[in-house]
């Protein structure tokens, strides 16, 4: 599962987190480590659609459309991980993102008794890294509250969707 992020930064420049995740997913696919890529992200607005953008870039990298499955309700990491299990039937999963994000995703997966491993995309350095560290600190606190205090699940579940051949 490839976790979503914006294709561009607020200043309009390409987001290195996004493109490094695409490269990581493509590397896993072309090395034969994964056969399908579940792209999970936010698409609350027509003009902002993380799964569509990830699919487009993965196809540009040479990955066939038939090997890309889109999850349009991955509004946050909790949604993406739980939907991977409950909607897409994945109990064993490789999660692709940067290390800081993967640590949170793996925590959620283990909370839901999933067999999950992480593949870490390259982390950009500099000011972006510092901003992300602050955001991640807050996201982890929210995750703990969501899981252990509020016991929140995903915003949407839905009809089960099978990945791969039937």
Stretches found by the model and what they are:
Residues 1-134:
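A structural signal for short, hydrophobic/glycine-enriched beta-strand patches
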Residues 133-156:
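A transmembrane-helix-recognition feature enriched in membrane-embedded lipid enzymes
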Residues 154-166:
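Short linear elements at protein peripheries
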